[in-house]
């Protein structure tokens, strides 16, 4: 059964609020990126709210939490609350989708922007205790050689905020963990969250999203049960058919027919029939 928080209990570390705050407050989103990445950003734009990228027919699409651009960089910010062993593969897939979305037909590869895939996790995905894991492609034979493909993946482990030396990052990670603002920026985040909660239209939006998700969950559960029943029936038929072939082969063996002819008659392999004679 799916569980949804009450609207009044939502925090910045819940997906609805996380996306709402960063989508509707461009200055806050830009400041967050600058704090996490330690870079200066001129401005950001939102290519599409709740961007879904699916470049090929029947390919797996991806819905990005927060997808923004500046003049020569693209950023995907993902909030991850639940344990997930697939984060490394998800970063690879998200990266490929960003590239497909940002290189038009006829453009040169040199026009690809620098991309950042950022995961903010409420757990340590690699169990090494680091507050930040940064990945870039390097040469195994010469670690000093960076591939320079302008692809950077940063995974933040909020549970290790106490050992993060950068005070801005530490304060943000702590806020993700316990929702207690400890600096001006997290105070601003907390204030925006409370303002969002005061508007009834946001509450209705959140509730309608939950109804949609709950319907999808129930539909998927029903389809899964039906598929399981169908597979069980097919498996039973298959097993029954196999057993019938074996019984037929046993009867034919008592009639002194050749193993080759029995194999042709039943569809069993010669090896299977030889096993019945032992």
Annotated model-derived regions:
Residues 1-6, 71-80, 166-278:
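Short, charged alpha-helical interaction segments and adjacent helix-coil junctions
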Residues 1-204:
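Conserved single-residue anchors adjacent to enzymatic active/cofactor-binding motifs
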